[in-house]
Amino acid sequence: MSTWTGKRVAVLYGGRSSEREVSLRTGAACADALRQKGHEVVLLDVDLEVAARLRAERVEVAFVALHGRFGEDGSIQGLLESMAIPYTGSGVLASAMGMDKTVSKAIFRSLGLAVADYRVFPRASAGSIGVGDLPFGLPCVVKPAGEGSSVGVHLVNEAAELGPACRDAASHAGDVIVERYVKGTEVDVAVLDGKALGAIEIVPANAFYDYAAKYTAGTTKYFYPARLPEAHVRAVMQAAEAAHRGIGCSGVTRVDFIVAGDGTPYILEVNTLPGMTATSLVPKIAAGLGLSFPDLCERILDGAALKA
């Protein structure tokens, strides 16, 4: 029996971020899965009245199914802490650090994890960034520091592409990060309660795994387990666990890597609230271990707690 059997569960989804549509899918899928396990579930689309609605609905525990700003960055976690409502996923500080790529990259380096060379530029100077500002040259990857789901991310191969890419990244959240492009195999690792569940290989139809590749059906192939030498899989899973611990995460995370030809796992980011539809990557990995989607959601719910 679940820790929260008989309790009123709110699945928090939607919200105001650029990843709202993804969150709506995640929340609906998780709510359905928890109902299949017998839980009393109310779906709450997070808005400026969410605190009043949590009280009105007599919520006893929150399943956080938000993505992006205001949901994955510690904001909703802080509200839940102040209301003494236990919640799933990482706490305020871990969520904030995981969302800010500038902070998380510095932490990864301090842990001894492989991080591609990068530079951080203030949003105000994005329009003046040139190839001469990049000691690693081209190709490079441009991304906003405070977004997820590859929103505002660009692969830049030519000098003429750099300015527009930087200006677009600056239109999103956070500073602009420009990092050396690492050629290799894209691999994501699911971590649950500090233990790596497995590694899945991602093969997009084009050279770059961008927003369209993630969310347009049929544009990307996935291979689980990842088609890598066993030693490389072990290395990437160990790195994922180290990143999860280093950020101070709780519950489930998805840690993204590029595994170079020599087996070096270059870490990209930790997703403290990964996509959780029945066809998302974390559920795919869990299914490979015999853990159904409803069982996975209940495992995550069982870890709900106050973290402050």
From Swiss-Prot:
Gene Ontology cellular-component annotations: cytoplasm
GO terms under biological process: cell wall organization; peptidoglycan biosynthetic process; regulation of cell shape
Organism: Anaeromyxobacter dehalogenans (strain 2CP-1 / ATCC BAA-258)
NCBIfam families per record: D_ala_D_alaTIGR, PRK01372.1
GO molecular function, one term: ATP binding
Required cofactor names: Mg(2+); Mn(2+)
Keywords for this protein: ATP-binding, Cell shape, Cell wall biogenesis/degradation, Cytoplasm, Ligase, Magnesium, Manganese, Metal-binding, Nucleotide-binding, Peptidoglycan synthesis
Subcellular location: Cytoplasm
Main enzyme class: ligase
Gene: ddl
HAMAP family associated with the record: Dala_Dala_lig (MF_00047)
Role according to the record: Cell wall formation.
PANTHER family in the record: D-ALANINE--D-ALANINE LIGASE, D-ALANINE--D-ALANINE LIGASE B
Protein known as: D-alanine--D-alanine ligase
Family as reported in the entry's similarity comment: Belongs to the D-alanine--D-alanine ligase family.
Binding site for Mg(2+) 1: D256, E269
